[in-house]
Amino acid sequence: MGNRTQQIAGIDKKDIMNRRLADNYWKKEELKLPDHYRMISAGAFQDNIRIERLLLGNRMEALGKDSFRHCIALREARLPHSVERLGEGCFADCPRLREAYMSQNLQAIPNSAFREDRRLEKILFTRDCDIFRIGKDAFSECVKLPAILLPRKVKEIDDRAFYRCKELKRVRFPEGLIRIGKEAFYFCGLESLELPESLEILDEKAFFKCTQLTEVCLPTHIRRIEKWVFHGCSRLKVLEIRHDPEYIGEWIINKAARIRCYRGSKVDMYCQESGFTVEYLE
């Protein structure tokens, strides 16, 4: 390498906290790093048993994959607004993590970021943050999470993003959301749905076994309703579809529910072919 400074993602090596350096902080309950650090490398603090709180400097830009995975004492993760990137699984499997505060400049919540954080109760985003995507399994099995207000710029909620979040009763979906992925809200506690008009794709089993839902009205720009979207929603009485999507998959509801639509529409034909009870709109 000669005298050339080593870099990772445009960051000098001397400004990266790696696993070897992290060992110097192994017994700290409050992690406060020197201000010059701009990145924490993959797995740097993984399996730490002491850290309870993070106090990261205002030059920190990136947290690597699994950087704080399975930090069993971690209770609060507060990211400075300088953080732009999180690695996959960065806060996964933290059994005592209760609160997480996201950075203003964060671009996305990566895959498995908070997966199986079973005591997570609060996830806060700044009003105008740049997050456009919630990754696969990002909050999967966060069983204590009661509500979430998604950032205004989110376009996609990827597969299993909130899988089996059993206490999740309220979600504010942003106008501009385009896709809700496969099993994104599988077996959640949602009591009602207000989906934005921008929504185009409801992927397979998106709201499977959301047993508290009783009535849902779909926005009129949805192009694809994949199979089993509301199947297993045992209390669902009515699914209202006021337009003709390009595609409707099989068994989108239970037989006990009914579909409210316009007489003679493609949705009406789908119901007749599938044996679903129909209620006609005036």
Kindly give the residue locations of the regions a language model identified.
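A structural signal for leucine-rich repeat
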Residues: 92, 114-115, 138-140, 163, ...
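Consensus positions within tandem repeat domains that build extended binding/scaffold surfaces
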Residues: 21, 42-44, 64-67, 87-90, ...
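Structural signature of tandem-repeat unit edges
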Residues: 1-15, 24-39, 49-62, 72-85, ...
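Eukaryotic intrinsically disordered and solvent-exposed regulatory patches
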Residues: 18
